Amino acid sequence: GNGSTMGGVIVDAGNFDWSSGKFPEFTTPSDGYHGLVLHDVLGPAAYIAKVRIEGLRDLGAAISPFNAFQIIQGLETLEIRMKKHSENALALAEWLEAHEDVAWVNYPGLKSSKYNELAKKYLPEGQSGILAFGLKGGFDAGKTVADETKLFALVANFGDSKSLVIHPASTTHQQLTPEEQASTGVTPDLIRLSVGLENVEDLKADLQQAFDKV
């Protein structure tokens, strides 16, 4: 629950079409394997093969005992934490959507989202604590807000019990050209929030005081 360990379980039925054009990592030559095109050789098994030949190689076959302990400990409160993450994120997204300084908000729980029907179908209990938005002031406004928050921590992590903020265009993606940033979905104004478990009114107040400094 504190973002200190990440882990998961992969289940692959082996019947997904990876050649749809949306997954170039399976249909283009792999530099790490002498130009091998995974889908050409393995078809639907391309995904699980990539997990084994790259994930297993880079991350190892088993997590450490301490990380396993942290995951088990976190699972004890996962359900109640996810409900709070989702409730806070939806409330914050609705507040941002109505804010005069905000140009756009991307959160699938919003009724205005083009993904809302899918979100309700596949994520009926809540749509997570991750959301993104952009300010009308563009790049400079986004960077200022990320720098000026007090309750939100400025880090590239996500999924923590505490709220996190980042302005990708000036941090994680700053080495990319504007065209490369755009190809990854990063716009100059984009601010990503990982909404934590704090009182949502405190989170709104923190963002507002940062907006006021733009």
What are the roles of these predicted feature ranges?
Residues 81, 147, 163-214:
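PLP-dependent enzyme catalytic core of the Aspartate aminotransferase-like
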Residues 1-130, 134-161:
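Active-site C-terminal subdomain of aminotransferase-like
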